[in-house]
């Protein structure tokens, strides 16, 4: 299967995107197509052996829309084309100004005669009715020309059997203009045949002002909507702007500045104080304080030195270093983040599919309601003038856009808000599902704990602490075990001189033996001491105490004499307890799963306050724990970082990977926490709840608006209350509904997580 991003032009509302999706998804060989109305693009997955891009594009063009394969930029991540968007905004602004000028003229002339506003005498009085009508028509024609897109797209879609919002506007405005023309011919007939008694009926039904002002108001709404929608992708634009345009490279002993696109893997790059890191890499010389706030949300600079990884787009606030480029273009962390965010905003949440389905039937239903309403009023004895007013009002007040925009705008803004806080959401489905989570499973190592053992206790017997630590490190420095590495690191941190060990031997599951200064020495657990016939009876209380604290005690022997004990532990992250408390305060049950023994698991459970600890769990058992909870009816989020967490992450309703984890875990997850901070789990779920609340608000008001507005426009309340909606007010209301939905979604940018 091949995935392709297509740019699509000519879409005006959700009926358009729904139509494209429906038709393309029916094509043989197409597995899935998801159209993003906000970004005018579509992600399509298809079988190349059956269908290709050309066939898909041709099918879209047959529907009356433009389509082309998206041209990826230097970052090789699918991103909004800002230049195209800016150009479209500029063109729309010109259309808006022209529409308002000429629509304003026809509106002033029409309403001025009714309300006594100052007007030239040659259009006043019964004898000048025809001149007045012709002048209004003259002002109206430029508006029709300026906003001809509504007619071109609307009529084309209407004739193809896929009417959209443009179709409603085209029919409403076009019917008004045609009725105005009919009135002009009627007035000409009245003057030509001296039937001045017919003039008032025609003069009161010109409708040129309705035709022009409807188009102008819709254009105002579209412009405001486009401006608001441009802010929905601010997070992606901000990420795109992080990438520097150039890099300072050192090749063959010479330094020079080159475009970042020319950097290749293995290049040595120089990053001075205040400069941005061009691509991903590792420091090979020097050090710096890296500002990673734009990617992780972490406000304080992070100190980096030789061997540390650096991320392209971060800023070196102080220091000077050389780095080796390890990832460029689409392989950089920043490009992957942009791609993840873009793909998430292009995916559809299940709740969006309901709105899309409704939108697909909405426009034909509205046209039917307009025709039926007009026919009913004619049958009740109303005039053609009244019936036409009803039909036009119904057409222009209905707004499929409000329904279509309700979900994608909230998803896009919410996903961007998450990215700004270091929470990458890979799909809209995950964002929707997360708000229903009632159970959170946390892996222990690397998630609750730091994942890197450290020395916690040094308990010497007959020697000093430093002597014991140096002796232990000398024994362990050839070991590849994480516990041994922790002891060596502690000794090196104190700059202790380590003795040289000989005849080194590793005993699996017990420890190591070696010769130091001619003496037989050993380091290991209680089992090793028992094998060496060292008396352990006095050590049991100490062992139990350390184990109950989640620590692993290691004992050190020289020439059969016990020198002391060093305890090593994978320490709990500073924010883990607070994060678990916040999840519980949000009404969630929190479990910890680990492959560690029961004593260690219980010690960590007591320390951080999880509701339950499941110990000695194999990788496949973690997935089974998730499945069991799901079978009990729980919505489960799994948080982990390792390869052994991948099956459980994939099985969970929402898989959340710690950003410092393995690529496999990140690939299997639905969300990625860049900062590797458990507090962000609560933030992600809180964000999901806020987004879903926003979507429901948008859908509620969009449905209410149409449910109330359409009957009002159809004249349902006219007989009882005398309420009749003017087409101009209907057009204004329609524009406001779309703008209000987008504006409400933009509030998500400022929520506190």
PLM regions and their residue ranges:
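Conserved cytosolic catalytic headpiece of P-type ATPases
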Residues: 1, 36-38, 302-309, 315, ...
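Flexible metal-binding regulatory segments at protein termini and peripheral loops
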Residues: 1-133, 156, 229, 254-255, ...
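Conserved ATP-binding TGD loop and adjacent catalytic N/P-domain core of P-type ATPases
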Residues: 1-2, 18, 516-518, 552, ...
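Conserved cytosolic catalytic loops of P-type ATPases
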Residues: 28-50, 205-208, 237-331, 429-472, ...
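Actuator/coupling domain of P-type ATPases
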Residues: 55, 61-70, 75-80, 134, ...
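Signature of the cytosolic headpiece of P-type E1-E2 ATPases
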Residues: 103, 200, 483, 492-603, ...
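Membrane-embedded alpha-helical bundles of multi-pass transporters
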Residues: 115-131, 159, 178, 417, ...
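Hydrophobic alpha-helical transmembrane segments
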Residues: 138-150, 160, 174, 210-239, ...
